[in-house]
Amino acid sequence: MKPMKNLLLMGLLSALGAGGALAAERSHFTHFITRDGATLKDGDKVFRFAGIHAPELHRIEDDARGPCRADPRGWGQYFKWPTAQEQQNWIQAMVQTGAKAQRVYVLSVQQEFDKACGRETHILAPETADGMPRLNEKAMRVYDNMIAEADKQGLRLILPFIDHWWWWGGREQLAAFYHEKAEDFYRTDSKTFKAYLDVIRQVITRTNTVTGRAYYDEKAIMAWETGNELEDTNADFLHQTAAWIKKWAPHQLVVDGTYKKINPFALTDPNVDIVSNHYYTNADNNHPGQVTQDLRAVGGQKVYLVGEFGLLPADQLNAIMQSIVHSEVNGAQAAGGLIWGFRGHRHDGGFYWHKESTGHYSYHLPGFAKEGEANQEQAVVDLVRTAAAQMAGQQTMAPLPKPEAPLLRETTSPFAINWMGAAVGRSYDVERAASPTGPWTVVGRDISDGVNEWNPETMVLFRDDYRQLQLGHTYYYRVTAKNESGRSAPSNVISVQHSEENQPPVVTLEPALTTTQDQGVELTASWQDDGLPSREVKVGWQHAGDGQVHFCHADRAQTRAWFTAPGTYALTFTADDGLLKSSKTVTVTVGEAAGKAPADFCRYHGEVYGVAEGRLTVM
């Protein structure tokens, strides 16, 4: 497009865009990020960054719920939209640990199993057979807030459009709207490619409902990426896509979102600013030397970025990150690198998490040495913070700021107290009072919310001590966050009336059993408890007789017993919650041996008996 026509077009878009541009709030950034040869610039300053890749700033894969069984692919997950407070917290955690830029995951595409799994997506099927895809307004408002929050807190964003893969719905699902194949996405004469371009147009020209600005005027958006790991990108596809993005967003950069290689045609495309690669072991490029290899291939013609790498031990990740920081070819260096991958605080306590097929978990900020030990979490977070500091010309990472106050959530039980953790909080103290103004008593110290595989259905951050509370009384709680730099101000105060009276465990047991001496008997009891005064319930079997009964494991609900003589025996199972207990008795009638007794009754037929069985019902 000729320059004059382009200027007229952008002027028209600005006039139509946020119905006012006069109503748009002022950006917290002074400059768009620009490209100067092989270097990114913020104004006249070189812009480089390191971080932990945050794929889910705009859509959450809620692993705690497990896979959706209605999705026959087997791994199909449940998804939900993050709350505004979650987005604010996550971005704050990144910025306060040194991040200057972040790449998110793609826009999700509707597919056939979404309805059965209750999933919502960013891109919806067209309303007519050959119509264009539609943007889901609910989803895009979450996207709006992500961009607004990034602007407010000083984080630049790299935003890819469509996925090569089908995890969130990608090119295959887009093609399905038009009864085409996944590979048609890369054909510039296909209906799928036409739809892809229209999605790009709709997104870039969208008016942000939070800031009032058109997306193409958002300085927080550093770059648009053609997609995620588009490994079949060809010259015509990239040429048309990059030109289309620049047509609508002339002030923002364009990333060739390819994978496993540097496309020579990207280096000569005038509309491509950044070339990217992802390093993974299955791509045979997950090593420090790949940085120099790619920089040589780029030859200083474009900015080079390592958009993702990871799923390695911390020492190997550090070697790659240090190569990203220091490698140089004819004066050109990588602009940045992002380790896969981050998950943030949950709105109502704990962290989201994800476990890769390699066994690696997502990383939590600011890093948790004990809870993340198996994942080397603290070492990984620290190596990233160090790299970010080095890129900024510093020798060591800056200390964390003191945490801000956590957000204590309302509850109906003093035994289910949760809070949204501070962005860089490492541990928490819980205080209780009899009035909303104190005096306050610390009732919980050094509580961590960094547990991996957090399940909000079964876990809570803090349970008060039942023995210290009086039934019917109202208590007040507040929480403070701590890290190595200090302590936060107290959280908001909540009030809770203690109305839960401890009930004894409920035991279920068969009343009578019959066996012979050579068989012994399998004993199976079950119990339910209200979780008070704690979640610990001691169980046990006993016989008040003359020692002729032997238990494999008397302290387990399921076990075996054997008898030294025929007779009738009363075996009692007891469940004790520490304050109250319940018992039931089974009468076992034992006849004379009908065969040879086993050498070991506790390994009867090769099975080991004694598995504990019980259930807590938390009220």
Segments (PLM) and residue ranges:
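Active-site mouth of glycoside hydrolases
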Residues: 26-274, 278-286, 292, 297-302, ...
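Substrate-binding cleft of secreted/luminal carbohydrate-active enzymes
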Residues: 305-391
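Pro/Thr/Ser/Gly-rich low-complexity, intrinsically disordered linker/stalk tracts
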Residues: 390-424, 471, 489-501
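Extracellular acidic, Ser/Thr/Pro-rich low-complexity tracts
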Residues: 421-426, 483, 526-532, 545, ...
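Recognizes extended acidic, P/S/T-rich segments that occur
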Residues: 429-470
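Low-complexity "stalk/linker" and mucin-like segments enriched in Ser/Thr/Pro/Ala/Gly
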Residues: 449-457, 542-556
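Residue-level recognition of secondary-structure-to-loop junctions
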Residues: 469, 541-544, 551-553, 561-565
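Beta-strand-rich modules
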Residues: 469-485
